[in-house]
């Protein structure tokens, strides 16, 4: 969806737009600026321009490649305008934050759609779009750590950290984060603990509890399909 290779077919006499995957599986929804499934980078500004072209057609019917047709010129126009304005807003806010010297993680936390641009995010997500737009303009180097320049990730020293900190301290810290409602931080700490002791039962249990907490939040929140499928896959493959 939303990719540069997507083509649409316009039937002017019937005012029918055969949209393919241009809008994704649901209309309207926040699009995937860049998917997590290994596709090529999508250009946000070009997508906005394409939306402007489709809005100008003023279609009465949208026939997508997924789900049911959407019928009604006003409904379709408002839906396309909302998608365009939402993407434009996220794009512009990301650029403004970059120019202000903020990190990508700061912007992923801060940028939210205003109520008048609100869209479902079960396909694309705003915070992931922020990250995609950042990397589209900045590339892979985030200007945050010298270690980004070298093929030695933080995980390479996790076992050493586990040995120095001690599993008991790490487990206590991970559990404390979970109690405080910070399951992602729990995952960070359990990854360190498991690097030192891959079969540590307490670390494995805390990791699974953190994954379950994230899954419950996802299912009761944005209901993003990619996030839900990933979390389920991690629970399914847990030892």
Question: Which role does the model predict for each range below?
Answer:
Residues 56-61, 69-239:
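Accessory terminal helices/loops
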Residues 1-98:
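Metallo-beta-lactamase
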């Amino acid at each position: 969806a939303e990719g540069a290779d997507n083509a649409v077919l316009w039937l002017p006499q019937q005012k029918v737009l055969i949209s393919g995957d241009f809008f994704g599986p649901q209309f309207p929804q926040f699009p995937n600026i860049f998917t997590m499934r290994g596709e090529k980078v999508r250009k946000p500004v070009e997508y906005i321009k394409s939306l402007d072209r489709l809005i100008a057609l003023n279609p009465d019917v949208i026939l997508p490649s997924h789900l049911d047709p959407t019928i009604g010129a006003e409904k379709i126009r408002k839906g396309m305008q909302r998608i365009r304005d939402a993407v434009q807003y996220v794009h512009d806010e990301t650029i403004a934050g970059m120019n202000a010297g903020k990190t990508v993680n700061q912007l992923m936390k801060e940028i939210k759609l205003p109520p008048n641009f609100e869209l479902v995010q079960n396909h694309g997500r705003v915070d992931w779009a922020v990250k995609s737009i950042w990397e589209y303009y900045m590339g892979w180097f985030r200007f945050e750590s010298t270690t980004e320049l070298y093929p030695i990730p933080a995980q390479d020293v996790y076992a050493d950290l586990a040995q120095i900190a001690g599993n008991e301290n790490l487990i206590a810290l991970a559990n404390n984060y979970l109690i405080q409602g910070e399951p992602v931080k729990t995952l960070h700490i359990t990854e360190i603990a498991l690097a030192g002791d891959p079969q540590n039962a307490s670390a494995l249990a805390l990791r699974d509890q953190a994954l379950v907490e994230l899954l419950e939040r996802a299912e009761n929140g944005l209901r993003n399909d990619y996030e839900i499928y990933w979390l389920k896959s991690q629970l399914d493959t847990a030892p």
